[in-house]
Amino acid sequence: MPKVGMEPLRRKALIDATISAIGERGSLDVTMSEIAGRAGVSSALAHHYFGAKDELLFATMRHILAELTIDMRRALQSAKSPRERVSAVVAVNFSDIQFQAQTIAAWLAFYVEAQKSSALRRLLKIYARRLHSNLMSGLTGILPRAEADSAAEATAAMIDGLYIRRALKDGVPNAATAIALVEDYLETKLGERQKQ
């Protein structure tokens, strides 16, 4: 008989194990059995909770996005100005939870898999829209809409690019450096606007 109340804990353990396994391999080439072993549960239980591996991968991506969303809401609520909102978005994207090797590897693996999976592609589109919207929530208070849109696109591209460099272990070594690079771009962009 299953232990009452264990399902949420086991689901979370399986999701964490998925991130860990993908991070170690650098790809989605992991088995349910391997993930279950890392989580300390049987393969049968992993299949019971998630069905197929694709469903577990989808749940893992949703979990990563949910963590990002929670942290983003908290950061945006404490921002007191449009400029602080933009900086909050940048900082959350490079937080300790998001900008660690295992999570970065998971992000990149999901990007690759989204080319084949409509469900993962949909999640990545949601992420991209939210990132753009969150950046625009600050930038439109500083720049005209068209310029804000362009700056949001460039900032999002920098964030994604810095993730790729970190995953390849080529370039940006840590979150502080990544934040500084993006903030430098923003200061340059916003400074140009103030000179006009």
UniProtKB/Swiss-Prot annotation:
The keyword Transcription regulation applies. One of its GO terms (molecular function) is transcription cis-regulatory region binding. Keywords: DNA-binding, Repressor, Transcription, Transcription regulation. InterPro entries: BetI_C, DNA-bd_HTH_TetR-type_CS, Homeodomain-like_sf, HTH-type_TetR-like_transc_reg, HTH_TetR, Tet_transcr_reg_TetR-rel_C_sf, Tscrpt_rep_BetI. Pathway: Amine and polyamine biosynthesis; betaine biosynthesis via choline pathway [regulation]. HAMAP family: HTH_type_BetI. Repressor involved in the biosynthesis of the osmoprotectant glycine betaine. It represses transcription of the choline transporter BetT and the genes of BetAB involved in the synthesis of glycine betaine. This is HTH-type transcriptional regulator BetI. The gene is betI.
